[in-house]
A protein has these predicted regions:
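Accessory alpha-helical/coil subdomains and C-terminal extensions
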Residues: 74-155, 163
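Short, acidic/small-residue loops that bind anionic groups at enzyme active sites
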Residues: 14-45, 51-55, 179-188
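Short acidic, glycine-rich surface-loop motifs adjacent to enzyme active sites
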Residues: 1-10, 151-163
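Internal gly/pro-rich beta-alpha loop/helix module
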Residues: 30-101
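Short Gly/Thr/Asp-enriched flexible loops that form oxyanion-binding sites at enzyme active sites
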Residues: 3-25, 166-175
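Short, ordered loop/turn segments at secondary-structure junctions
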Residues: 6-7, 32-35, 161-163, 188-193
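C-terminal non-catalytic interaction/assembly regions of soluble proteins
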Residues: 163-235
């Protein structure tokens, strides 16, 4: 299957499909960074490559893939790294799964499953619990956290600095929520690196804030406990 998608949220949608579709068949997301009217539009070649990739038997058992700019990678790790350039989609540390040569996919590795990957069955899910993303900054207080909860959020993702860092006021409020079993996941706004286990809140591990949001919402929809959610993220 090939899914054409706007590039701004392509990585988020592809990740959602990756953790909800449990099938050996490939799902390939593709988009374009340049409009069709550009002198060197990238859309037509990207689409041809994506269709060729989806039809390849070597693409089986690799989960959801993202294909742009003559390269393809796992939706589990790939993110958008630049607002305008055609080589924007990358997995900074994990790397690409392969490239295209004369519109034919060439794989660098045999099929493998990302460490820690979980798949959710959403066949009977009609709506997902509300999870919001809050941006961490200096001198931040807990007001937005409380406002999000009052507005119906069942979980929160903090897009923190560095290793999911937050200030003392926010950390104190998260510690209180920990005791209530309310999940707050601490991600990082850097483009690479893990967020390690936390005393206050849940470290996001390898997941970006947007991917953490999907994962937390899916976990809540299946009734996972706070401890199970923490274990799923790795901390």
């Amino acid at each position: 299957m090939v899914v054409t998608h706007g590039t701004d949220t392509l990585a988020e949608s592809a990740f959602f499909i990756d953790v909800t579709v449990n099938s050996p068949k490939p799902v390939v997301f593709v988009g374009a960074m340049r409009p069709a009217t550009a002198i060197s539009a990238d859309g037509p070649m990207n689409l041809l490559n994506a269709v060729t990739l989806a039809a390849s038997k070597d693409a089986m058992n690799r989960g959801t893939l993202i294909a742009l700019n003559d390269r393809f990678g796992s939706a589990f790790y790939t993110i958008k790294t630049n607002s305008t350039t055609v080589d924007t989609f990358k997995a900074e540390e994990q790397g690409f799964l392969g490239t295209f040569t004369s519109a034919k996919p060439y794989f660098w590795f045999s099929p493998a499953t990302p460490v820690g990957k979980v798949t959710f069955d959403v066949s009977n899910v009609t709506s997902l619990p509300k999870v919001v993303i809050l941006y961490a900054y200096q001198d931040q207080d807990a007001a937005l956290i409380d406002a999000a909860i009052k507005d119906g959020a069942k979980g929160i993702v903090i897009d923190g600095s560095g290793n999911g860092s937050i200030n003392s006021a926010v950390k104190k409020r998260i510690a209180e929520l920990d005791k209530q079993g309310f999940p707050v996941v601490r991600a990082t706004r850097t483009n690479s690196g893990l967020v390690t286990a936390k005393t206050e809140g849940i470290g996001a591990g390898v997941y970006s804030a947007s991917k953490s949001r999907w994962l937390l919402s899916l976990a809540l929809s299946t009734g996972l406990s706070y401890d199970q959610i923490k274990s799923m993220f790795g901390g």
